[in-house]
Amino acid sequence: MIIIDEISLVSHSLFQKVNKRLNEIFEVSDKSGVYFGNIPVLLFGDLAQCEPVAAKQVFWRAPGETFSLWSDLFRPINFNINMRQGEDRHFFDILCRMRLGMSLLDFNND
C-alpha cells in the first residue's frame, strides 16, 4: 500500500507522474486500465490548506480530459469532528476561519 499524506501539496502533474512511474516499475501498460502499478493508494490531507507551489491542484481537470485519476479513482471520506481542539471551542473557531482564509479582524473574542 502506498500512503500519501498532505495530498493538497501534490500537484496534478506530479500525481500523474507517480501513476506513470509506478506503472513502469511494476510493468503495467498505461492502456491496461490499471493505475498506480496495481498498488492500493491511500491519500490524506485537507484540500483547503496549502496548494502546490506554481502548479495546478491534484483535483484539477484539464480541458478535454476524459479521465481523471483524482475524481474517477478516489472517493473522499470527510471527517467532521475535530479531535485535536475539541475542548477549546474558541481556538477551534479561529483555526477554522484561518483554514478557509476568512478574516480574524471581525472575529468575536467572547
Residue ranges and their predicted role:
Residues 1-110:
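Conserved ATP-binding/catalytic motifs of P-loop helicase motor domains
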